[in-house]
């Protein structure tokens, strides 16, 4: 019998995750949990005596939830984890804060170095995990440290060096939930910051299918190469499986054309990886996370 810890937050059983993802596909979470605050989350983790599998869920922007759903407990940090504070020349930002919202806050307060976040969908927590980046900037360039909690309920702190940022990854333990990120602050000019953010937005609109059901970049760029060029060279621009296709506008973006399943999207991605390897000898690595049971 499934026994859930007593919490202040909210549980939902057999909860559909489809509407929470940018692709709008996928199955249900066996248990969906939104903790009230970090102490509530710690209490849940400490009480998880059955060792229920734990999956963390952010803004759903760079993720495929498989059609079979997710076993165990899927944890989503809500509004109580999205605060932005300016303390002692540092920004302290909750992990569920959207990258876009932090970029706007920084522009309004004449803080430079965060302009690139306006072009990165998702949350601060997800950005840290992926070392997300665009337009010649990455999270590793602005992070001082993070505050996190492990699956045993222990609060931990990691400095930038300890995080071990790499291209689209890091050396953090896998059984970790990021709670806050601390950023260094460099003052700039609000108008110049806004101009740069507008340049980024205009570039995205011109080159990326941002109005489609997409999950952002599908594959990380191999060293010294561009994934989209390899995909294009293999003749896969616009290639379709079921309701999923590679974008005609930017062929490193997958699109749900309205009737795709998670299987369509993942099968398309795997097919593209196979064909690019056959064509160029390069093994593309997924940038989009795939979670749950493949069916």
Curated annotation (Swiss-Prot):
Catalysed reactions listed for this entry: UDP-N-acetyl-alpha-D-muramate + NADP(+) = UDP-N-acetyl-3-O-(1-carboxyvinyl)-alpha-D-glucosamine + NADPH + H(+)
EC number: 1.3.1.98
Pfam families: FAD_binding_4, MurB_C
Active site: 168, 217 (proton donor), 287
Keywords tagged on the record: Cell cycle, Cell division, Cell shape, Cell wall biogenesis/degradation, Cytoplasm, FAD, Flavoprotein, NADP, Oxidoreductase, Peptidoglycan synthesis
InterPro entries in the cross-refs: FAD-bd_PCMH, FAD-bd_PCMH-like_sf, FAD-bd_PCMH_sub1, FAD-bd_PCMH_sub2, MurB, MurB_C, MurB_C_sf, Oxid_FAD_bind_N
Keyword Nucleotide-binding attached: no
Xref: Gene3D superfamilies: 3.30.465.10, UDP-N-acetylenolpyruvoylglucosamine reductase, C-terminal domain, Uridine Diphospho-n-acetylenolpyruvylglucosamine Reductase, domain 2
GO cellular component labels: cytosol
GO molecular function, one term: FAD binding
Lineage: superkingdom: Bacteria
Main location: cytoplasm
Class of this enzyme: oxidoreductase
Involved pathway(s): Cell wall biogenesis; peptidoglycan biosynthesis
UniProt-listed GO biological process terms: cell division; cell wall organization; peptidoglycan biosynthetic process; regulation of cell shape
Function: Cell wall formation.
Entry's family note: Belongs to the MurB family.
Protein name: UDP-N-acetylenolpyruvoylglucosamine reductase
Source species: Rickettsia felis (strain ATCC VR-1525 / URRWXCal2)
Organism lineage string: Bacteria, Pseudomonadati, Pseudomonadota, Alphaproteobacteria, Rickettsiales
């Amino acid at each position: 019998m499934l026994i859930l810890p007593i919490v202040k937050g909210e549980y939902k059983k057999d909860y559909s995750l489809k509407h929470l993802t940018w692709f709008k596909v996928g199955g249900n979470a066996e248990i969906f949990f939104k903790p009230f605050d970090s102490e509530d989350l710690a209490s849940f983790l400490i009480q998880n005596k059955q060792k229920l599998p734990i999956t963390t869920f952010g803004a759903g922007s760079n993720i495929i939830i498989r059609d079979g759903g997710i076993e165990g407990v899927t944890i989503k940090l809500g509004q109580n984890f999205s605060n932005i504070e300016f303390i002692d020349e540092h920004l302290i930002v909750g992990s569920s804060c959207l990258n876009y919202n932090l970029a706007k806050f920084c522009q309004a307060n004449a803080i430079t170095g965060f302009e690139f976040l306006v072009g990165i969908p998702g949350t601060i927590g997800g950005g840290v995990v992926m070392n997300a980046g665009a337009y010649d900037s990455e999270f590793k360039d602005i992070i001082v440290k993070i505050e996190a909690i492990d699956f045993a309920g222990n609060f931990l702190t990691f400095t930038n060096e300890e995080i071990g940022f790499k291209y689209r990854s890091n050396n953090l333990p896998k059984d970790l939930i990021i709670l806050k990120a601390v950023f260094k602050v460099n003052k700039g000019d609000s108008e110049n910051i806004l101009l740069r953010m507008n340049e980024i937005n205009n570039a995205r609109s011109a080159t990326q299918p941002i109005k489609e059901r997409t999950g952002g970049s599908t594959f990380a760029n191999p060293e010294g190469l561009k994934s989209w060029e390899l995909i294009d060279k293999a003749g896969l621009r616009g290639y379709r499986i079921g309701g999923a296709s590679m974008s005609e506008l930017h062929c490193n973006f997958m699109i749900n054309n309205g009737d795709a399943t998670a299987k369509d999207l993942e099968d398309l991605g795997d097919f593209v990886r196979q064909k690019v390897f056959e064509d160029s000898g390069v093994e593309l690595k997924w940038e989009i996370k795939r979670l749950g049971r493949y069916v």
